[in-house]
Swiss-Prot record:
Protein function: Catalyzes the specific phosphorylation of the 3-hydroxyl group of shikimic acid using ATP as a cosubstrate.
Name of the protein in its database record: Shikimate kinase
Binding note for cofactor: Binds 1 Mg(2+) ion per subunit.
Organism the protein comes from: Prochlorococcus marinus (strain MIT 9211)
UniProt EC number: 2.7.1.71
């Protein structure tokens, strides 16, 4: 089956369910999301971009003024609004999985964990000028601490894709292949509501 046929089959079987990309900072969710969305004829939303637009503040400014708890409250509100829509690929913030109430929304769609190799993730984060409030000071130790804390939660994802140096296009194809396998399983997403256009 060629890639186009695979994407068409997956899109049909998804029935309008949102795809939520989760993973650590620097894993490529925001780079892969638009590519995957285009291949599936889905819309694309980046949760952090929506938060910044709605609050008219950067993520760092929100952390400075509201702290992590305040930021997570805003993030949950935005996720709830996004969850009312369908046929979206959603790039989430790395910590969105840490709030149990978010999982109720995430599992209305399909949760895809992009698991980037640690050294490559750290290399990307070192060269990225985007302020990362939770990775201030000792990048390696803070990254490892966050990953250890989040790993059991990431493992609850519907799809787990380990990646290294692949292009966003290759990651999107890998996601689609995994989705195809998931959706073809009898137990794959039973009980999840599909949305008919």
């Amino acid at each position: 089956m060629d890639d186009l046929s695979r994407f068409n089959q997956v899109c049909k079987k998804l029935g309008g369910r949102n795809l939520y990309l989760v993973g650590m900072m620097g894993s490529g969710k925001s780079r892969t999301g638009p590519v995957l969305a285009k291949k599936l004829s889905y819309g694309f939303v980046d949760v952090d971009d929506v938060i910044e637009k709605v609050t008219n503040q950067s993520i760092s400014e929100i952390f400075d003024q509201e702290g992590e708890i305040g930021f997570r409250e805003i993030e949950t509100q935005i996720l709830q609004e996004i969850g009312q829509r369908h046929s979206l690929v959603v790039a989430t913030g790395g910590g969105i999985v840490t709030r149990p109430e978010n999982w109720g929304i995430l599992h209305q769609g399909v949760v895809i964990w992009i698991d980037l190799d640690r050294e490559i993730a750290l290399s990307r984060l070192r060269s990225d000028e985007t302020p990362r409030p939770l990775l201030q000071k000792n990048l390696d130790d803070n990254f490892d601490c966050l990953f250890k804390e989040r790993l059991p939660i990431y493992l609850e994802s519907d799809v787990h894709l380990s990646v290294r140096e692949e292009s966003p296009d290759d990651v999107a194809i890998g996601i689609c292949t995994n989705l195809q396998l998931l959706l073809l399983k009898d137990e794959g997403l039973d009980g999840r509501q599909t949305i008919e256009e």
